[in-house]
Amino acid sequence: QLCLLQPLGSGGFGSVYKATYHGATVAVKQVKKSSKNRLASRQSFWAELNVAWLQHDNVVRVVAASTCAPASQNSLGTIIMEYVGNITLHHVIYGTGDVWRQGEDDEGGCGRLALSMEETVCYSCDIMTGLAFLHSQGIVHLDLKPANVFITEQGVCKIGDFGCSQKLEEGLSQSLHVCQQGGTYTHRAPELLKGERVTA
């Protein structure tokens, strides 16, 4: 029922593949067992599932997940998500990967077109709408950066890669809301850099 087609990318905690699941095109993330930090690998897998029950136009949807995997795969589990393509905001901003918008830009003439004002506003609204929804559900992403914002063929931004996310539970001690996981240092919220409480 699940057939891997081609690799889309890999990161610190696993690899992502384009695949089919019951005939539908999906993305599959296999979270690998880390020999160096098994706890962090496990936390990343379960953090991805913080959004498993959510549905929103600007959040990558989880279709299914499983902790069953052949021993040969060295995998903690598999997460099946909607396929939104392989273009990220990072590709669009920096002209990398499959996206290279040819033309003369306004700054330096390096051959890459700057985002139009309309695109910038639309993308920003999509991201803010997705974040507002996540925060209304008590979920903080903790690794939001251009590489984790996917752009569909229809030009809709979807927030993905929830491996560092946390679900904030009301009534829990504030000390429990301190970030225990990584995330990209250069994109961290100021309160995390100061060692303060995570907030939505």
Swiss-Prot record:
Keywords: ATP-binding, Kinase, Nucleotide-binding, Serine/threonine-protein kinase, Transferase. Its EC number is 2.7.11.1. Gene3D superfamilies: Phosphorylase Kinase, domain 1, Transferase(Phosphotransferase) domain 1. The keyword Kinase applies. One of its GO terms (molecular function) is protein serine/threonine kinase activity. The gene is MOS. ATP binds at L8, G9, S10, G11, G12, F13, G14, S15, V16, K29. It catalyses: L-seryl-[protein] + ATP = O-phospho-L-seryl-[protein] + ADP + H(+); L-threonyl-[protein] + ATP = O-phospho-L-threonyl-[protein] + ADP + H(+). InterPro entries: Kinase-like_dom_sf, Prot_kinase_dom, Protein_kinase_ATP_BS, Ser/Thr_kinase_AS, Ser/Thr_Kinases-Pseudokinases. The active site is at D143. Belongs to the protein kinase superfamily. Ser/Thr protein kinase family. Transmembrane segments: none annotated. This is Serine/threonine-protein kinase mos. Residues 2-200 form the Protein kinase domain. It comes from Nycticorax nycticorax. Pfam families: Pkinase.
